[in-house]
Design a protein with these regions (language model features):
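Short internal beta-strands
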Residues: 53-57, 128, 287, 303
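Active-site metal-binding loops of divalent metal-dependent hydrolases
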Residues: 13, 108-109
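Short N-terminal binding/cap micro-motifs at the start of the first secondary-structure element
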Residues: 14-19, 135
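Left-handed beta-helix
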Residues: 181-329
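A structural signal for short hydrophobic beta-strand segments in well-ordered beta-sheet cores
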Residues: 28, 139-142, 211
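Conserved N-terminal catalytic core of the sugar/cofactor nucleotidyltransferase
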Residues: 1-8, 16, 30, 34-105, ...
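Conserved core of the sugar-phosphate nucleotidyltransferase
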Residues: 110-186
């Protein structure tokens, strides 16, 4: 795929992922051994993206530190100082909307998609997926092979083709003009400047949009969907770490080399992150974050935050950063 610039909005607070987002921005929450944003950037870099604009907000300095410490991408950081919708976020990055095509990709969703399908596209294109209940998503209606209408979170379903958060914009200046119209005329939907409204305005002005199918679409916005994403990412891995003496690893798992695991059964679908300590425990279908301690316990479908400590009995729990929990029998 020819080199492409990516625009990645990551400003959201992540209220549905509390307590983990009390101390971290949502995109830095750990899944399968690294932050959500790390998996997204890894995929973009592997597919030829060489530069990006990252739109930060809540705890944006932590995002900047993570990206600059771990990636050599040419990255520009732009702050969204008010949470006024996705359209407003992209407007904050309007200097990146020039003549060359751009890829807008949401920073809290992991995709399994071959972006090379976009390189030969003459027109802008939206990633879509069929869903049973479209009321939580923006949706598209197509006529004659092109998008004719976009609707943000329709109360009455008009289409089951959900917009998943991947937008290939072949003429970014047209998007910039549409966003400028929304902002200048204070055109909001449900109190926010919606990107779907800007795209609809482009369609109304004659811009052509096609769609492309995205089968692998993994939301990281809630604890249960974060665990689903963890399962998917672990399943994709071929490497299996060797279990220390006295331990059993049931694939697929991720165990960071710096983690200490003693007398434990890990997996399936378990992630043990950097500096974590697991002793006398069973951990399955769970995420144990950096420097967390888990002992004398069986965990299932749980997320343990950074520097948290959990001991006790069989449980399904979500524990925020730096917490200490001792469960009695």
């Amino acid at each position: 795929m020819p080199t492409m610039h990516a625009i990645i909005p990551v400003a959201g607070i992540g209220t549905r992922l509390r307590p983990f987002t009390h101390s971290l921005p949502k995109v830095l929450v750990n899944v399968a051994g690294k932050p959500i944003l790390g998996h997204i950037l890894d995929s973009l870099v592997a597919q030829g993206v060489t530069s990006a604009t990252i739109i930060t907000g809540y705890k944006g300095e932590l995002v900047e530190d993570y990206v600059t410490s771990n990636y050599t991408l040419d990255v520009t950081f732009v702050e969204q100082d008010e949470m006024l919708g996705l359209g407003h976020a992209i407007w904050c990055a309007r200097e990146s909307l020039g003549d060359a095509p751009v890829l807008i990709i949401l920073g809290d969703t992991v995709f399994d998609v071959d972006l090379s399908v976009l390189s030969s596209r003459q027109f802008s294109s939206l990633g879509v997926k069929y869903v049973d209940d479209p009321r939580r998503f923006g949706v598209v209606i197509e006529e004659g092979g092109f998008v004719s209408r976009l609707v943000e979170k329709p109360e009455t379903p008009v289409s089951n083709m959900a917009i998943v958060g991947l937008y290939y914009i072949s003429r970014p200046t047209e998007l910039r003009n549409a966003l400028e119209t929304l902002i200048a005329n204070d055109l909001r939907t449900k109190g926010e400047y919606q990107l779907t409204d800007a795209l609809q305005l482009m369609v109304d002005r004659g811009e052509k949009f096609t769609t492309f199918s995205v089968d692998g679409w993994y939301d990281c916005g809630k604890p249960e969907t974060l665990l689903q994403t963890n399962r998917f990412l672990l399943t994709k891995r071929n490497a299996m770490p060797a279990a220390p003496q006295g331990c059993v690893f049931v694939p697929p798992v991720h165990v960071d080399p710096s983690a200490i695991v003693e007398h434990s059964v890990i997996g399936p679908y378990a992630s043990i992150s950097k500096g974590a300590v697991v002793r006398n425990a069973i951990v399955r279908d769970s995420i144990v974050s950096d420097a967390a301690t888990v002992s004398d316990i069986a965990l299932d479908q749980s997320i343990i935050g950074e520097n948290a400590e959990v001991t006790g009995r069989f449980s399904s729990i979500n524990i925020g950063d730096a917490s200490i929990v001792r469960l009695s029998q």
